[in-house]
Amino acid sequence: MALFDEVKEVIVEQLNVAPEEVKPEAKFVEDLGADSLDVVEMIMALEEKFEIEIPDSEAEKIQTVQDVIDFIEKAKA
């Protein structure tokens, strides 16, 4: 499964949005309707799924689906 699809799966489950709404450029708050708690829970789910640690300082910079993908790719490199 491609990284985007794995990330998308977590986002759809955590934010309860339709899969077609999850695009690389989609912003979690503005486009997907997430609030700050939703974002925190989503970050925690992503950390668990990909076995990575996303520090708070980095989590604050993650605004879009692509930001998550970029971070995971760097963390796994």
Curated annotation (Swiss-Prot):
PTM entry text: 4'-phosphopantetheine is transferred from CoA to a specific serine of apo-ACP by AcpS. This modification is essential for activity because fatty acids are bound in thioester linkage to the sulfhydryl of the prosthetic group.
Name of the protein in question: Acyl carrier protein
Keyword Cytoplasm belongs to the record: yes
Known role: Carrier of the growing fatty acid chain in fatty acid biosynthesis.
Subcellular location per the Swiss-Prot or TrEMBL entry: Cytoplasm
Designated gene of the protein: acpP
Gene3D superfamilies per UniProt: ACP-like
PROSITE patterns: CARRIER, PHOSPHOPANTETHEINE
Pfam families assigned: PP-binding
Keyword Lipid metabolism among record annotations: yes
Pathway the protein acts in: Lipid metabolism; fatty acid biosynthesis
CC annotations in GO: cytosol; membrane
Family from the record: Belongs to the acyl carrier protein (ACP) family.
Keywords: Cytoplasm, Fatty acid biosynthesis, Fatty acid metabolism, Lipid biosynthesis, Lipid metabolism, Phosphopantetheine, Phosphoprotein
Annotated organism of origin: Nautilia profundicola (strain ATCC BAA-1463 / DSM 18972 / AmH)
MF-aspect GO terms: acyl binding; acyl carrier activity
Annotated positions of the O-(pantetheine 4'-phosphoryl)serine modification: S36
Major subcellular location class: cytoplasm
Single GO BP term: lipid A biosynthetic process
Residue ranges constituting the Carrier domain according to the UniProt record: 1-76
